[in-house]
């Protein structure tokens, strides 16, 4: 009887001393446009009891669809910091997901030469077909006031400063 009691006490001590839910880290940084899943195992050191756990958003304006978190009205979470928690019954373990944009715009076309008329405005996107989840802007120092051949660098940027430079003549 004393042996059984000792085993029960030891089991309770071992179970009671375990930390249970342990996050891999307090802040997770994810690239803009990447899926942010509501799967607890992605954020835990030990996923032994993950079937009873749930990832919940603590930030407003976030929807959960198909086990993914996204900004309301979008297919992804926009750039920013978001509060989440792993819920285990009535206990919550908070963490942050930081969404960053570090990727430059992508150009569908690689143009090396263009011809424009004197005084013509240039629609750079019609040549490069650049895309980025954060939008794109074009910057080029070109003079179309007279006929000439020019070597021009076109800087294609997103609103977070990521850019790519294309050379055209």
Predicted regions and their residues:
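Positively charged n-region of N-terminal signal peptides that target proteins for export
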Residues: 1-4
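Residue-level signal for mature regions of secreted extracellular proteins and peptides
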Residues: 10-11, 100
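C-terminal motif of bacterial Sec signal peptides marking the signal peptidase cleavage site
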Residues: 13-16
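Solvent-exposed, low-complexity, repeat-rich "mucin-like" stalks and linkers
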Residues: 18-60, 103-135
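Well-ordered beta-strand positions in beta-sheet-rich domains
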Residues: 27, 92-96, 111-113, 165-169
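Serine/threonine-rich, repeat-prone extracellular segments and beta-strand-based repeat modules
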Residues: 48-93, 133-168
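Interdomain boundary/hinge segments at the C-termini of tandem beta-sandwich modules
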Residues: 97-103
